[in-house]
Amino acid sequence: MTNIRKTHPLMKILNKTFIDLPTPSNISSWWNFGSLLGLCLTVQILTGLFLAMHYTPDTSTAFSSITHICRDVNYGWMIRHLHANGASMFFICLYIHIGRGLYYGSYLFKKTWNIGVLLLFTTMATAFMGYVLPWGQMSFWGATVITNLLSAIPYIGTTLVEWVWGGFSVDKATLTRFFALHFILPFIIVALTTVHLLFLHETGSNNPMGIPSNMDKIPFHPYHTIKDILGALLLMFVLLTLTLLAPDLLGDPDNYTPANPLNTPAHIKPEWYFLFAYAILRSIPNKLGGVLALLFSILILLFIPLLHTSKQRSMMFRPLSQLLFWLLMTDLLVLTWIGGQPVEHPYIIMGQLASILYFLLILVMMPTASFIENKILKW
């Protein structure tokens, strides 16, 4: 008798995706982060669902509804902090996943890569809107500052901002629509993830050496399922440790003060995972220029397949490119640190230099290094 998992219409799809999927035998732990992102998304949707059962998207009661969740709901404090810190874990996994794609040349699967960039944008939008919901000081002012960037768009800017706000300032209408969008977007992310996997399984996974591995494939289960379970346990350990021992470590103390339109916080800054982009935005004195730089700092990922000049796919055997890659990672860490600092000397000039270096590395230095490596290898 044929196994049901190979004949049943639904089981057959799952079987081809997670059980009998031919996988390269040499993929390292850097390939674990895709499944970890799936786990993060599941945790976020489940905790978010329970939070939505008790939350009220109204300016007069939003802040107190969060207090009610933390004080009166059974394990509400835990659900709330799992959701907040789960977002941080999500972005850590996301950035490592993108970094691995850059290092090993996975971006040459163009369809998969482009859907991935779209997923990044959607996740960033979801996280931003989620940060507004507690209606604390940083929620309100973060929403005001970031949505106000749309006013830099010539001619239609002001109209667009008022359309997004649903009025003449960030108010009840803004909070209600942000809650609606924050609720629906994760399900759109699930749909996009399915498409992401669909495109990936058209080509099969890349591997650390960046060479075809068709002659050396192993089934996904049990070899990679057990490996993914270990990764999942480690991720949950870190998330639970963070949630139970230092729940507010990555948050902003200002968000424990209810939103007050008459009192501006000393330093308006987004969550830590947006600080690198925020630093790039702030480093340009012109408003429109800053917005374009902010947008391009993420959109640049779409151009990476076009900037690939090396004859080798992976950076595994390219020391010059490796050096520039780690310089880029360091630069992003510097930008993240700068984004959290006040706008004063020496942070302004450091942010400007780090921003210039970021674009230079991706657009000029890395393609040039690849070209030089080709010449050295007489290719």
UniProtKB/Swiss-Prot annotation:
SUPFAM superfamilies: a domain/subunit of cytochrome bc1 complex (Ubiquinol-cytochrome c reductase) (SSF81648), Transmembrane di-heme cytochromes (SSF81342)
Superkingdom per UniProt: Eukaryota
GO molecular function: metal ion binding; ubiquinol-cytochrome-c reductase activity
Residues the record lists as binding heme b b562: H83, H182
Binding site for a ubiquinone: H201
GO terms (BP aspect): mitochondrial electron transport, ubiquinol to cytochrome c
Cofactor binding description: Binds 2 heme b groups non-covalently.
Subcellular location: Mitochondrion inner membrane
Annotated TM spans: 33-53, 77-98, 113-133, 178-198, 226-246, 288-308, 320-340, 347-367
Membrane topology: Multi-pass membrane protein
Annotated keywords: Electron transport, Heme, Iron, Membrane, Metal-binding, Mitochondrion, Mitochondrion inner membrane, Respiratory chain, Transmembrane, Transmembrane helix, Transport, Ubiquinone
Binding site for heme b b566: H97, H196
Pfam families found in the cross-reference section: Cytochrom_B_C, Cytochrome_B
GO CC list: mitochondrial inner membrane; respiratory chain complex III
Gene3D superfamilies registered for this protein in UniProt: Cytochrome Bc1 Complex, Chain C
Statement: the UniProt record of this protein carries the keyword Mitochondrion: yes
Subunit-level organization: The cytochrome bc1 complex contains 11 subunits: 3 respiratory subunits (MT-CYB, CYC1 and UQCRFS1), 2 core proteins (UQCRC1 and UQCRC2) and 6 low-molecular weight proteins (UQCRH/QCR6, UQCRB/QCR7, UQCRQ/QCR8, UQCR10/QCR9, UQCR11/QCR10 and a cleavage product of UQCRFS1). This cytochrome bc1 complex then forms a dimer.
Family: Belongs to the cytochrome b family.
Note: Heme 1 (or BL or b562) is low-potential and absorbs at about 562 nm, and heme 2 (or BH or b566) is high-potential and absorbs at about 566 nm.
PANTHER family attached to this UniProt entry: CYTOCHROME B
Protein name: Cytochrome b
Species assigned in the record: Lipotes vexillifer (Yangtze river dolphin)
Lineage: Eukaryota, Metazoa, Chordata, Craniata, Vertebrata
